[in-house]
């Protein structure tokens, strides 16, 4: 489920192959956008035990005018975040489609489904790939000009990339 624009060397595939694009389901709920800019942070559903990274993002984004929605999975406890700033919400899971329909930037691990959904809704990415597949996906997104790859898992690097995207 990809497009010829996203598939590297798509011109080398024969007519036996059909590029049908991503399969995007409908949103199951509506997300309220409370501020001018909505930042969505999710590092996927498998390798997301990243409490230091999440806390660094909270520290970097706490005093901004951005609304931040973080989906952190079940490997970290929401209670361990303590009191959160008014502009930041943390959940174990969210309806990603509903959030992406309103998001201005998606901070992502670059899983193929997440990237496909982000591109479908025209949400630029701040990319923090963790696996070789995700690194390949991030490279293609960078080539297409649809996101910025960040090499360091820290809040300052993420915030710098977010600000760069929003200033374009």
What are these regions (language model features)?
Residues 6-105:
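Donor-nucleotide binding loops and adjacent catalytic segments primarily
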Residues 2, 7, 57, 78-168:
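Nucleotide-activated sugar donor-binding and catalytic core shared by glycosyltransferases
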């Amino acid at each position: 489920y990809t497009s010829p624009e996203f598939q590297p060397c798509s011109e080398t595939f024969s007519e036996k192959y059909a590029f049908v694009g991503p399969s995007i389901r409908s949103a199951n709920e509506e997300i309220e956008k409370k501020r001018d800019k909505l930042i969505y942070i999710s590092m996927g559903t498998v390798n997301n035990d990243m409490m230091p990274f999440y806390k660094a993002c909270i520290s970097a984004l706490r005093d901004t005018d951005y609304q931040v929605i973080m989906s952190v999975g079940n490997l970290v406890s929401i209670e361990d975040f303590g009191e959160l700033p008014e502009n930041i919400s943390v959940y174990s899971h969210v309806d990603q489609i509903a959030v992406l329909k309103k998001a201005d930037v998606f901070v992502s691990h670059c899983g193929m489904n997440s990237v496909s959904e982000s591109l479908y809704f025209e949400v630029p990415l701040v990319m923090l790939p963790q696996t070789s597949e995700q690194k390949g996906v991030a490279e293609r997104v960078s080539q297409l000009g649809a996101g910025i790859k960040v090499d360091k898992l820290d809040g300052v690097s993420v915030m710098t990339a977010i600000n760069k995207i929003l200033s374009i």
